[in-house]
Amino acid sequence: MINFRIICKIIGSLLFIEAFFMTWCAVMAIYFHEEDQIAFLMSLLITFGSGFLFLLFGRNAENALSRKDAFLLVTAVWVIFSFFGMFPFLIHGSIANLTDAYFETMSGFTTTGASIIDDVEVLPHGILFWRSLMQWIGGLGIVFFTIAILPSLVGGSVKVFAAEATGPVKAKMHPRLTTTAKWIWSIYLILTVACGLSFWTAGMNWFEALNYSMTTTATGGFAIHNESTEYFHSPTIDYISITFQFLSGINFTLLYVSIVKLKFKSILKNSEFKLYVSVVVGATLWIMYLLSTRMNYDLERAFRCALFQVVSFITTTGMFNEDAGTWPHITWVILGVVMYLGACAGSTSGGFKCIRGVMLLKVIRNNFRQILHPNAVLPVKINGTNIPQSKLVALFAFFTLTILMTLFTSTIMIVAGIDNTNAITIALSCVSNVGPTLGTQIGPVMSWSVLPDYIKWILCPLMLMGRLEIMTVLVLFTRSFWKEN
């Protein structure tokens, strides 16, 4: 039986945390003497009051979660956080439409980065900061953040971690999950601070550096300029952005082992990291060649633009330093492939994940060997660890579901009159949490405001399923989930 009281208790506490973050946005609005301060004060009061009501309902709950409770909690938290997160937009009037406000907020928390705002530069500083902060909070997971700072709040935190973490294997760097969470969030914070200081040193003002550092390390992609990082016309800023997008796409557990424990060889021997680097290098060289020969770019510009877009798409950040929509169409195919693949599991990026790519390639290799040696027992090993059959079954289930969901959503959009290329890349972008799309109607530098409202409501759960890796959400719609036994 689902324990709704403990779920409400945890959601109530999390809404207090969301109200706390809104307070910082209100401070930002007051500092800049802008009109959005009222919107944030009202929003945080609504959020805080609602959190109190949730806590009131769950006040006598036992502090323990079952596996079913964990799945329902994680999905509910992301939906409810997005619901309350849209209030600053609606109250201020920067987004007047409820559909657009919820879409923008869901896109923010899931770090998709698809925006319906045509001109972000007219927004006040508090609203801009809220957009960036949403992505930074969602980067490693809302509930995972809570496990790090308030471990006693989430009973059964291992089950919650399994429901919210990305990748087929949920690695822990310490026997205590709370310690793991604190270390991972420490690395995340260090990356964010280092990124912000680098941007500031390269010429950004403090507000620009703060916002771009949060959306870069969260691999979210929201920008405070319409032209994203292209606004600065600075190769130095481009290379800084590339560096921190790339680092944020690496498994944070691997970063911890390599940097904190000084085991540098572990990162070079890691199968997932090697595939990640290989895809980035291969795709960059291919696009660099195409830009040099077909667009007459000089070598440095071709290398920088190709590397930026490849890293941006594979880490599912979605920032841009040039309009890739004007590039040869073959580059769209390359970017579409890396967009679907994604970076490493256990990072802030979305997508299929390189670890699943490694597993898939090894299964295919073993299948060829099995044809030649029918009686051979061929285990799938990754980094010296045998992958159980259940994980391989889950791999193919996940792969099949992502393809089916992409095709289903694309078909609906094509019927709605959206061109084929846009329909496919929009679906891929949402299920992989990338943000930009490729096509003639909506390009990588355009907003998604032209989409019909009902399409936006279809894309919202798609973004959520992409962030929680599908199964966590879809299991709620199975009959067995709601059976008492």
PLM feature segments, named:
Residues 1-485:
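Membrane-proximal intracellular helices of multi-pass ion channels
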